[in-house]
Amino acid sequence: METLLAFKVKGGVLCLADSSVNHSIVKMKDDEDKILEIDGHKLLLSAGEAGDRVQFTEYISKNIKLYSLRNSYPMSTPAAANFIRNELATSIRSHPYSINLILAGYDKEVEDGGTSLYYMDYLGSLQKLNFGCHGYASYFLLGLLDRHHKCDLSLEDGINLMHLCTTELKTRFLVSGKYTLKFVSSEGIKVLPFNAPQ
C-alpha cells in the first residue's frame, strides 16, 4: 500500500513515505527511498508505477539542477512546483506518467516561515497545502490530520503525529511496512530515525 504523507511544522516540513515496491501481489523490495532530495532544501515524494516514478523524478531532479547551473542560483520551491506540474500536464497527451507527487521545500523568500508544501497528481493538478497525503492512506489520514495538525507544531510533536498516523495505518491495512522519514528546514535535509509500530 503506497503511502506518501507530509505536513508543515515549525521551521520546516516533515515527510514520510513507505519503503516498499510492489508488483501485483508480490513485494519486490522493502528498502526503496521514495523521497528524492532534489537539492539541499527540496524533497520530492513520489508514488506510482516503479518505472514512471524513477524515470520522472530523475528527469525532474536533473532539470532543476541544470537550471541552477545555467542561472547560478537555485530554483525556488514554488517555481519547481510549477515546473513539475507543467511537465506532468504536457506529458498527458504523449506519454502519461502514472505518478502522484508531493513537493516540500524551504526558501528564505517564501512567506509562511519559508516552508512550502505542494500536492500534485498524475493529471497535473497542483495545490499548495499545509498537509497532504497520497495513496490509500489518504482515506484514513486526512481526517486525522485535519483534527490534530497545526502549522506551529514542534518537530517532536510532528514526529509524534507521524507515529499516530502510522499506528492508524497499521490498524486499518492488512499489511504494514517500513517507512522513511525526512525533515527539510533552513538547515537543510535530515533523515530522521523512525520506527513504525509493529
Swiss-Prot record:
One Pfam family of this chain: Proteasome
Report whether Cytoplasm shows up as a keyword of the record: yes
Q: Which PROSITE patterns match?
A: PROTEASOME_BETA_2 (PS51476)
Q: Name one GO biological process term.
A: proteasome-mediated ubiquitin-dependent protein catabolic process
Where can this protein be found?
Cytoplasm; Nucleus
Keyword tags: Cytoplasm, Nucleus, Proteasome
- Give the chief site where it resides: cytoplasm
The record, for CDD domains, names:
proteasome_beta_type_2
State a GO cellular component annotated for this protein: cytoplasm
Family assignment from sequence similarity? Belongs to the peptidase T1B family.
How this chain assembles, per its entry, is: The 26S proteasome consists of a 20S proteasome core and two 19S regulatory subunits. The 20S proteasome core is composed of 28 subunits that are arranged in four stacked rings, resulting in a barrel-shaped structure. The two end rings are each formed by seven alpha subunits, and the two central rings are each formed by seven beta subunits. The catalytic chamber with the active sites is on the inside of the barrel.
Annotated function: Non-catalytic component of the proteasome, a multicatalytic proteinase complex which is characterized by its ability to cleave peptides with Arg, Phe, Tyr, Leu, and Glu adjacent to the leaving group at neutral or slightly basic pH. The proteasome has an ATP-dependent proteolytic activity.
The name of this protein is Proteasome subunit beta type-2
Q: Which organism is it from?
A: Dictyostelium discoideum
The top of its lineage is: Eukaryota, Amoebozoa, Evosea, Eumycetozoa, Dictyostelia
